[in-house]
Swiss-Prot record:
Domain tr-type G: from-to ranges: 8-275
Pfam families for the chain: EF-G_D2 (PF22042), GTP_EFTU (PF00009), RF3_C (PF16658)
Entry-linked HAMAP family: Rel_fac_3 (MF_00072)
Keyword tags: Cytoplasm, GTP-binding, Nucleotide-binding, Protein biosynthesis
Subcellular location as annotated: Cytoplasm
Record-given protein name: Peptide chain release factor 3
Top-rank taxon, per record: Bacteria
Role: Increases the formation of ribosomal termination complexes and stimulates activities of RF-1 and RF-2. It binds guanine nucleotides and has strong preference for UGA stop codons. It may interact directly with the ribosome. The stimulation of RF-1 and RF-2 is significantly reduced by GTP and GDP, but not by GMP.
Source organism of the structure: Lactococcus lactis subsp. cremoris (strain SK11)
GO cellular component: cytosol
GO biological process: regulation of translational termination
Residues reported in the UniProt entry to bind GTP: 17-24, 85-89, 139-142
Length: 523
């Protein structure tokens, strides 16, 4: 198979949602249909030890939440599928936002009873700004929920995107009968104990009149709704979908696996192939460019706690990866050999010999890489556009509970900070170690992982919220430190101030008008 044919097979997408909308459950079902797992583990099955495959950390298994992006790959219907299951919790939006830089499409999961929720709205705005196509799966049809027409209206009114249903529910909750699949010309009958059963349309494009469904009042109502939508609603346009202007909407129940395989088949038919990415010079690097290129969107420590390893996740943008190849690490200008490279099923992995544009590979990292790094070969020399960064809003002082375990404490901090979900600062005057995060849960996960993965108990002291501003090295003066600010350095050794509040920052500006305060560090 040629390189072009291989790249055309790739479908790389992220699943986004508000917490508890069923994102991890639908991920499990997709993996099951792809043959990657035999049985979908759900949050409900926690007592049996049958955990979600994509939730691989201990804390995820215990709490039933995803706190890190998982990468999973499988083949289905002639396509190579790369799924990135992202954290839904708002405290981990930084990891999610970076992950969205590595995909070509997004699947938005919505709880039929709750509609569009806060985190869904935030993530959709990121997807929209990037022009990523969005496919919507309205979940939990086996439970009582809101009217389907109201949910479609909400997509347009709250998210500002036109929608087109690809199927339509027949009843809901205890009256859920199935799905009217006008895309494929059939009815998918809901039989939770026996799986699904299809009723094909006749030559007139209708359910045969002899079938009992035609006398079912819920089916009659669904038929009327569907005909109204087909006549007066938006028409399906593949071009508008790929442009991110129209979202195809699918209904189903991930927990009972109903409607999920139909969704997968249709999604793979219309989801885009790998797309180009821009460099800092605005040059578009196409997937078919023969030179290899990719960028690191995530670093994860301890995917195998036995070996204290660290994996850098690379989205391949162009060309082909071959095991043992030398690449240029653009940030340093140095050559790096990619010899120990893996692909994933959550925490499970296997060595990979080849991968192409659109694939996600894991490179073992001994401290060489940073989130946002670009890897290239041949004539490609420029970095890709920078990944989004977030200024922390909450801060904690942290120290080792046992001073005799300072080495494991420092190793844990170094590795977990490198993942990018939590920021490290060191006081210029006292040497105190401070951590910054966008939400409280990040601190809880940090503390938990330090104990589990590095056997290092920590003492964490809240500092409240602070405002971070960087300064230039030549402006650094210890005398500028006061009771209203903390002079510190970040993990890259850049100088900065942690201001108590906006008033303290304005006071500083008035006293030192020539000092430039930067929201992000720039050279």
């Amino acid at each position: 198979m040629t390189l072009q044919e291989e790249i055309k097979k790739r479908r790389t997408f992220a699943i986004i949602s508000h917490p508890d909308a069923g994102k991890t459950t639908i991920t499990e079902q997709l993996l099951k249909f792809g043959g990657a797992i035999r049985e979908a583990g759900t949050v409900k099955a926690r007592k049996t030890g049958n955990f979600a495959k994509s939730d691989w950390m201990d804390i995820e298994k215990e709490r039933g939440i995803s706190v890190t992006s998982s990468v999973m790959q499988f083949d289905y219907a002639g396509k190579r599928v790369n799924i990135l299951d992202t954290p839904g919790h708002e405290d981990f939006s930084e990891d999610t936002y970076r992950t969205l830089m590595a995909v070509d499409a997004a699947v938005m999961v919505i709880d039929s009873a709750k509609g569009i929720e806060a985190q869904t709205k935030k993530l959709f705005q990121v997807v929209k700004r990037r022009g990523i196509p969005v496919f919507t799966f309205i979940n939990k049809l086996d439970r009582d929920g809101r009217e389907p027409l109201d949910l479609l209206s909400e997509l347009e009114e709250i998210l500002g995107i036109a929608s087109v249903p690809m199927n339509w529910p027949i009843g809901m909750g205890k009256n859920f009968q199935g799905l009217y699949d006008f895309t494929h010309g059939r009815v998918e009958v809901y039989q939770p104990e026996d799986g699904k059963r299809f009723v094909e349309f006749d030559e007139n494009g209708e359910v045969p009149t002899s079938h009992p469904l035609t006398k079912n009042p819920f089916f009659t109502q669904a038929l009327e709704d569907a005909e109204l939508l087909l006549d007066a609603g938006n028409q399906f346009s593949e071009d508008e979908v790929v442009a991110g202007q129209l979202t195809p909407v699918f209904f189903g129940s991930a927990l009972t696996s109903f409607g999920v395989e139909t969704f997968l088949e249709t999604f793979l038919e219309y989801a885009p192939e790998p797309h180009s990415h821009k460099t800092v010079d605005e040059e578009e690097i196409e997937p078919l460019n023969p030179d290899f290129s990719g960028f690191i969107f995530k670093i994860q420590a301890n995917m195998d706690p036995r070996h204290r390893d660290r994996i850098a996740f690379v989205r391949i943008v162009s060309g082909e990866f071959e095991r043992g190849m030398d690449v240029n690490l653009v940030r340093t200008g140095k050559k790096v050999k990619l010899s120990n490279v893996t692909q994933f099923m959550a925490e499970s992995r296997e060595n990979v010999e080849n991968a192409v544009a659109g694939d996600i590979i894991g490179v073992y990292d001994t401290g060489t890489y940073q989130v946002g790094d670009t890897l290239t070969t041949g004539k490609l020399k420029k970095s890709f556009e920078p990944l989004p960064t977030f200024t922390p809003e909450l801060f904690m002082r942290v120290q080792a509970k046992n001073v005799m375990k300072q080495k494991s404490f420092q190793k844990g901090i170094d590795q977990l900070v490198q993942e990018g979900a939590i920021q490290l600062y060191k006081s210029y005057t006292t040497g105190d170690i401070m951590l910054g995060a966008v939400g409280q849960l990040q601190f809880e996960v940090f503390k938990d992982r330090m104990e589990r993965e590095y056997n290092s108990e920590t003492i964490m002291t809240p500092m409240g919220s602070k405002t971070v501003r960087w300064i230039k090295e030549e402006d650094l003066d210890e005398k500028m430190s006061s009771s209203r600010n903390i002079l510190a350095r970040d993990r890259f050794d850049h100088p900065l101030f942690l201001f108590e509040n906006e008033f303290a920052m304005r006071w500083f500006k008035d006293k030192y008008p020539d000092i430039e305060l930067m929201e992000q560090f720039s050279v």
